[in-house]
């Protein structure tokens, strides 16, 4: 392995998360902080790609769970469609949060959606048991019946215990609610 590759592997870029878009001044756009150097590299790369391809927009972030969730959000959901997800406090993916794909980043027909507005995606979070480590299945079923979501999204960035797929998918199937 070359010294250059080792240097990159030993750098801050190998282990630091930089989800979201670069912070701009006092505007915080990242879920994790301490990303000033990554922000600078990403901004430079974005500007270089725009210049190279003579385009107005470019996204240089690596393909990830965010990209997959964006495809679902843009292809399946419309403003006002409620969804039920795991909160980031419960290990849920950042894209399931108000600052992620299903929160403020989703667009509908070219119009940016703003969290809490009529054209946003109303986010509901799976209730947790008292220990805050497990999904409360009974309360989740109640939430599904009450909210009648367009879809539910299981899965997390942090898995400590299995998700209640079997328990919730049956309820959703009976109501025609897709489970992702």
Residue ranges and their predicted role:
Residues 13, 18-67, 122:
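Conserved N-terminal alpha-helix of the aminotransferase class I/II PLP-enzyme fold
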Residues 57-60, 151-155, 180:
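Short catalytic-loop micro-motif centered on adjacent basic/acidic residues
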Residues 61-62, 85-88, 155-156:
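Glycine-rich, histidine-containing beta strand-loop boundary motifs that form or position
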Residues 70-74, 94-100, 136, 163-167:
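Short acidic, glycine/serine/threonine-rich loops at helix termini
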Residues 77-93:
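Conserved PLP-anchoring active-site segment centered on the Schiff-base-forming lysine
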Residues 99-154, 162:
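PLP-dependent aminotransferase-class I/II
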Residues 160-180:
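Catalytic PLP-binding core of fold-type I/II PLP enzymes
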